[in-house]
Amino acid sequence: MRPPNKEIPRILAFFTAFTLFGSTLALLPAPPAHAYVSSLGNLISSSVTGDTLTLTVDNGAEPSDDLLIVQAVQNGILKVDYRPNSITPSAKTPMLDPNKTWSAVGATINTTANPMTITTSNMKIEITKNPVRMTVKKADGTTLFWEPSGGGVFSDGVRFLHATGDNMYGIRSFNAFDSGGDLLRNSSNHAAHAGEQGDSGGPLIWSTAGYGLLVDSDGGYPYTDSTTGQMEFYYGGTPPEGRRYAKQNVEYYIMLGTPKEIMTDVGEITGKPPMLPKWSLGFMNFEWDTNQTEFTNNVDTYRAKNIPIDAYAFDYDWKKYGETNYGEFAWNTTNFPSASTTSLKSTMDAKGIKMIGITKPRIVTKDASANVTTQGTDATNGGYFYPGHNEYQDYFIPVTVRSIDPYNANERAWFWNHSTDALNKGIVGWWNDETDKVSSGGALYWFGNFTTGHMSQTMYEGGRAYTSGAQRVWQTARTFYPGAQRYATTLWSGDIGIQYNKGERINWAAGMQEQRAVMLSSVNNGQVKWGMDTGGFNQQDGTTNNPNPDLYARWMQFSALTPVFRVHGNNHQQRQPWYFGSTAEEASKEAIQLRYSLIPYMYAYERSAYENGNGLVRPLMQAYPTDAAVKNYTDAWMFGDWLLAAPVVDKQQTSKDIYLPSGSWIDYARGNAITGGQTIRYSVNPDTLTDMPLFIKKGAIIPTQKVQDYVGQASVTSVDVDVFPDTTQSSFTYYDDDGASYNYESGTYFKQNMTAQDNGSGSLSFTLGAKSGSYTPALQSYIVKLHGSAGTSVTNNSAAMTSYASLEALKAAAGEGWATGKDIYGDVTYVKVTAGTASSKSIAVTGVAAVSATTSQYEAEDASLSGNSVAAKASINTNHTGYTGTGFVDGLGNDGAGVTFYPKVKTGGDYNVSLRYANASGTAKSVSIFVNGKRVKSTSLANLANWDTWSTQSETLPLTAGVNVVTYKYYSDAGDTGNVNIDNITVPFAPIIGKYEAESAELSGGSSLNTNHWYYSGTAFVDGLSAVGAQVKYNVNVPSAGSYQVALRYANGSAATKTLSTYINGAKLGQTSFTSPGTNWNVWQDNVQTVTLNAGANTIAFKYDAADSGNINVDRLLLSTSAAGTPVSEQNLLDNPGFERDTSQTNNWIEWHPGTQAVAFGVDSGSTTNPPESPWSGDKRAYFFAAGAYQQSIHQTISVPVNNVKYKFEAWVRMKNTTPTTARAEIQNYGGSAIYANISNSGVWKYISVSDIMVTNGQIDVGFYVDSPGGTTLHIDDVRVTKQ
């Protein structure tokens, strides 16, 4: 049944609001002189004009009959205007596009029948005559929703019914303090409003059943009920925001179609977003509390580390806020001296940095001395203050301020005119903060729903006119109401908490996980350009606690797969990647690099948003509206039409369940093919933090480019196009323009349509349409990578193309051609085609060639080049001969210079990676190899005949499944000598030893993760194999069918042999026995058996069957074609060497301090200081500290596997603050004299090592000791003891 009558409480609310808000009701109507009927009566007459049906409806004793005007404005959009008592219609609210005009539809309107009908190609509207009621149907007659006899349109809104199984969306999102979570709005009574702090909402209700409803209203009260099928909207009384545009008539739109079509319709009605500048697809660093020196140093560090960044945003630090008259609009030249002229702008333009400045809808009216300001006087005289908002003291500095009124066109002009100097001196983006409400001290004032829109209108119209359309406007604000998108504004989710989820650290702010629903519901409300404070903003202590490295890295990966990629923290906080340790830094950098490689792909969706209202991110229920599994799914989304993103968002996550809709999918990072329509268990490595689950939809066409430091750094002359043909034709439109101006609106753009299809039997087709638009980009050619088959013949418009021996030869060729090869996805045909031709090209690939490649080659000139400074970076050169590709890398004579490759592999394990190098320095040289943020080893590179001579050096490296970060670096701490040239690396497709951690396996029947014993591999082991049915199942991948050795690492401290059953691909292989070495559960050993596996994916499971005895602990599994030695990742003999284990569990480190002294040792992430004192690698590190005098040590004694051989000790340490009496690493009880390695007070992480430790007594004791007068801080991380 319907909810209780809403008219009475709404009217009461109206008059209550009148008392509370007084003058804020200037935009509200006077109460009507006559009452309105509660529902429509019978038809009196009808008339038809073109696509419009006008109905005169009896309203009883009221003067002037009601008017109902129904117009088919598009084939799938119906506009309805109800005018009770035939009143004069109110002006449209700013929600609707004021410039929108509708073309003739050619609807068929029949008024003779009962019901009357309006028919288009997409819809059939039936309207009964007695009483007048509407039913909305598809063109085929399928009923979608209808007005019940007791409902329908009336003076306060609309009342419809729909089938109770329909899923509803829109209406609302969530603010920064909500728990959030749901996308469904099947039963909702939440108000339609812009809300506060990251919220979005509006009078929009739509369904995946194929329809939507949009009411022209400034706020209001939607109501849906899943039990009754009610879909209603009430204008009601004044909302809490107070201010409101008046609506006497009821004007609404009905939209029919798919979710994508409905969102297009919303854009048609409320306005499409203009294209944002291309640079805004890049990475942005927002910061509170900075100055020119720090800003410049940070920018230079980004550039030195080759971490791409396009924009830097400043909080009030950039302004002379409260210091001078009109200081709100002026650069603070104390903080930014070069901004007194255009010098800072010129410097940052040269570095590729766009500067963004914060603005707020308020001005200073009295300075700190209570002197009235000029701008305050001007605003008073001009009538620019927001009605109902009084003066109050700002929380930022002790000055008196008052809200200005962007609803007022004169105020908008005034505000913009005073912003031009900032623009001239470098501010090209606007951070429009606090357009939702004032909350400062005792002051609490709400802004109206359209404040964000009008504030954005100020800067958009002003900036566009001021630059004559030559410079696109970019803005962000923290609320959204439909219509605001017309003014080039994005939405960010407000001051969210620095935590994984709400309640993890603080219970009054949302965390990272909640942002998924916030983003997706905002997209469902029509705001497709959304971002967040990556890393979080709020913390319990206000400004001190920072994200821990795991949280930071996972948040960066999440944010890289959203429309707007930005970091921000609270006052004094840093959010640059290098503050969070090497593991998090490298994972974050890889995420940024991935995004920058996808710029051509993403920019196509920037154009799409302008053309049809659908942007880069769409919820899965929009893309798959009939799939019940995704109706409320927030754990993944479409990133463009061809990529599904499902980032890791749980703390120290080891596996992730991901639902993939129907169809075929390919793992972007690992290359595995996956059948959709199921939930998969995705293994996650919490050690490396490199996993970014991203899946390619079969049929995908994905353009990518070489990563640049910033968008537009260099001309893009070649674009790679990865194509994954499906049996049905797929398409993608490549798009480009100048990226900066609005000339695209008049046809100055570049478009080229691409299609692809798998025709079977190795036959692939790819078409490149003729280019359209008048813009000519620098692009010269596409390298089309047709995955799935290596052809024997390729034609272009039926003419044979030239074949080349390799991809490198093809790239170097002057003209078009083709080659074959293999990559992580399998066999591939490469085709080089000229871009931008006036006629189309039809590429046909036939035949199936055998590809024998067993490795992938990664060129150094395509790698990430870094250094300790911009001047000392590794660099590309061509001044020698014999290199592969287009160049090689030199500059490794500078300490800190490095070359970082991003190889992809299907499975984790040990790989023989070969480095191609040149060294004619006269002696062997060395560089360190880092893998996923951790140093693995130094490699010695022999001297060669000359610099034109190249050789290879292979090293066994531990890689993780998916993308890896492999860096060759001159690292003087480790004794490297550098000064070599690097050409490429080759990485095998298959490992020497495949390694699968138990914590990432599929667990069932009671098996679970634990960390309460020592020396396990990875981050946990599996126990709970203590009851029938308990199982651990490893998902493995092998390159070919055959026999493999399986080594399962286990612990059995029961002092008796135990058994489990082994299953291969679901079939029982037999019972496996696990012997026991005694009662020590910290002793691990391998059970080895030979199994037969299929090529590709397999499962290996160990299960407690009825005949088994179970009760063992299980660790990692190794897979190899021959006997596996000790993997590189297991060569460190220490327990808990990086201090990552939860401190609630025991470990082999023994802490000592004098009995009369408090302990001065602990383990944490270093996140409680500004800047954070993060670990060297991983998520935690150990520390020594006490304010007073202290002695402290930790030690670990281990048994060595081989006696009378040499061992090596390594560690990373950082000492700061007071220099101690003694600080050292200690090595003792190994059969020789104690060895002490002193630690220097450098304030930065330093690598220390001791080699050639001859162990003769079967054990070794290593540790650290500090004797301090007080105030010394020592950080310790990644401690190692390995056999030399």
UniProtKB/Swiss-Prot annotation:
Concerning SUPFAM superfamilies, the annotation shows:
(Trans)glycosidases (SSF51445), Galactose mutarotase-like (SSF74650), Galactose-binding domain-like (SSF49785), Glycosyl hydrolase domain (SSF51011)
Provide the alphabetized UniProt keywords: Carbohydrate metabolism, Glycosyltransferase, Repeat, Secreted, Signal, Transferase
Tell me which Gene3D superfamilies the record gives: Galactose-binding domain-like, Glycosidases, glycosyl hydrolase (family 31), Golgi alpha-mannosidase II
Tell me how activity varies with pH: Optimum pH is 6.0. Stable in the pH range 5.5 to 10.
Report the active site residues.
D433 (nucleophile), D436, D495 (proton donor)
Q: Name one GO cellular component term.
A: extracellular region
According to its UniProt entry, the protein's GO biological process terms are: carbohydrate metabolic process
Which ranges form a coiled coil?
none
Regulation affecting activity = Strongly activated and stabilized by various divalent cations. Strongly inhibited by Cu(2+), Hg(2+) and EDTA, and moderately inhibited by Tris.
MF term (GO), any: glycosyltransferase activity
Cellular compartments annotated: Secreted
> Which residue positions does the secretion signal occupy?
1-35
Q: Which Pfam families has this protein been placed in?
A: CBM_35, DUF5110, Glyco_hydro_31_2nd, Glyco_hydro_31_3rd
**Broadest EC class assigned to this enzyme:** transferase
> Which residue range or ranges hold the CBM6 domain?
856-988, 994-1120
Catalysis: reaction(s) = 2 D-maltotetraose = alpha-isomaltosyl-(1->4)-D-maltotriose + D-maltotriose; Transfers an alpha-D-glucosyl residue in a (1->4)-alpha-D-glucan to the primary hydroxy group of glucose, free or combined in a (1->4)-alpha-D-glucan
Enzyme Commission number(s): 2.4.1.24
Major place of residence? secreted
Q: Summarize the record's induction comment.
A: Part of the ctsUVWXYZ gene cluster, which contains genes for synthesis and transport of CTS.
Biological role: Glycosyltransferase involved, together with CtsY, in the conversion of alpha-1,4-glucan into a cyclic tetrasaccharide (CTS) constructed from four alpha-glucopyranosyl residues. Catalyzes an intermolecular transglucosylation in which a glucose residue at the non-reducing end of maltotetraose is transferred to the 6-OH of an other non-reducing glucose, leading to the formation of alpha-isomaltosyl-(1->4)-D-maltotriose. Has a wide substrate specificity, and acts on oligosaccharides with alpha-1,4-glucosidic linkages at the non-reducing end, except for maltose.
Protein family: Belongs to the glycosyl hydrolase 31 family.
Q: What is this protein called?
A: 1,6-alpha-glucosyltransferase
Native organism: Sporosarcina globispora
